[in-house]
Structures are given as C-alpha cells and as structure tokens.
C-alpha cells in the first residue's frame, strides 16, 4: 500500500487495516487544486491493490507499511493482521534495535514442530509416548479417552480460560498418573523419539542456527513432557546453549524409572516467564526487552508475562485447525496470524531483516 509523500491517509477516521488475502474494490483519491480530496471507487481489483492519490500526474510515493511490504505480508493469502499500523511499528522497532535487544519465547508442540506431514498428523511430545510400541496398550487406550474428553474443552471458544483451567489440571494429572503406572525407563525415551514421526516445522533449524549465531536467548515453554522435548531437540541437532526449556520433567528413581514429576505443573494456561526460577537465565535477559513470541494456542499469548517493562512483544500465532471458528479470537490475541502454515518462513524473514 502506498500514499503520496508526507500524506497520512485515515479515510474519515477509519484505519486502513484489512484482513489480508482476497480482492477488494480499489479506492482512489483525487486532490483538486483547491485541496478537498474526492474519493472514487472502482468496482474491481486494481493491478496493484494500492490506494493512491492522483492530481493530474502521478506523485512521488512512499510505502505506508514499508517493513511489512519487505516481508511480503501485505498480500499473502495465509496471513492475517488486524492492526497493520501497530504491527508495522512493532516489527520496525525490533529490526532497528537488532539482535542485542532481542529474546525469543516459543511454544514447542505444533509451533516449533509440524502439525502434519503428507497428510498424516505428526506426533507431539505426548503423542510420541502415546504412539510408541514401548508403551503398554492400556496406556494408549486411556490416553486417547482422555484426549477425546478434554481436548474439545481446551479449544472451546465459548469457555473462558478460567473455566478451562480446572479441566486442564485434571487432564494432566490423570495422564501423569498413567505414565507412572507404566514404569517408563529414562533410557527408552531416545528410542521413542527416534521411532516417532515428530518433525520440526520447516525452517525451524535455520531459525535456531541464526539465533544461536547472534547469541539470542530462546525460551521454549511446553505443557508437554520436558524430557521428551529435549530428546526431540537433540535428535534434530538444535539444542544449543542459548536455549532454555521450561516444561514438565520426569522424576526418576535410582534405576532410572519414572516415579513422578518435578516441580509445579505447567499446563497450556500458566506458561509465562513468572514460571521461571532460574536467576542465571534472567541474567541473560538484561536489556532484552524486545520479544518475538511464537505460539499455536490462545494460552500462549501470555508467555511473555514477566518480561521486564517497557517491552515490545511481537506475537505470531499459528492457527492450525478450526480456522473459521477460532480466527477472530486469534486475530484479537496475536499480532500476526498464520493459517495452516507448516513453515517458519515469516519468522525467518523478520530475523533476516535484522542482519
């Protein structure tokens, strides 16, 4: 989108933000010599999709959202942005501040990892265990029953977060009790991961490599199982020293058998920096008030709670299913929403601009 140099178009007080993708009528504004602008609307899409001023000759123009245009976000069919002006300002601030001011906070399952591959659902951390031949049949049966009962509650747009939390705690506690009954050994986890179909989202390895190169702290929050998550990171060779995992970790007995879980329960609605108790990690965050937050659920929006203020938090959300039902809520919560995107292309594009 472009406007004449020095002009800011508000269109009668309306902010020119739009849901991206899809044609719309083109609006032109003619500026007569006496100055009052006259609007003309064409009935179909223009070649450029731009809103432009005309006054006899084509004026010199500048982009209204230059950074978003560089990123290719203004015409991408899978991208939704509710407030273009705010996101332009956020991204521009992150880019101009550079890597030294940046930290990244990311969910893991279906954010750093793929949802599906060639039409088949990929394993999450829980799914790796659920689908492993090393687990007894009764575990898979019971785990599937719990999934069928509680997952619809997790994603129900008609329920508030406060209403969902008790059910999520019930779900996690029951799964954890099942795991303890199975007497899972620590040494079996590597085999579970290597035999699973878990895959990183395309471009995740490149993103992790670049963030490690520039020493950017990466905090991975997961309501899954931390021991399995760490095995996945090792398996794909992305578990670098700038990355910290906050999740539910197993407690083992002397023989390496799971007998419980360490610390407080992490579920999808209490993931935030207040859950971190490592002073060493917070030392790394000094002066890093710019955040790129990546998540696939509405609960992930709060992961940056606890970041020192003032801060600039760019929230990028992956909307993987039930798009029509959940799109409005995702656009309200995330700055950029990516629909059925199995890549890290948008995130990598932002990071490349910072170089």
What is each model feature region?
Residues 267-306:
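Conserved Lys-Pro-Asp/Glu-containing loop-to-beta segment of HAD-superfamily phosphomonoesterases
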Residues 20, 24-25:
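Compositionally biased, intrinsically disordered low-complexity segments enriched in Pro/Arg/Gln/His
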Residues 220-223, 290-340:
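Acidic, Mg2+-coordinating phosphoryl-transfer loop and its flanking beta/alpha structural elements
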Residues 241-283:
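Active-site-proximal segments of catalytic enzyme domains
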Residues 1-12:
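N-terminal chloroplast transit peptides
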Residues 51-254, 329-330, 334:
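Alpha-helical substrate-recognition element adjacent to the catalytic core
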Residues 332-355:
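C-terminal functional extensions of proteins
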Residues 39-41:
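N-terminal mitochondrial targeting presequences
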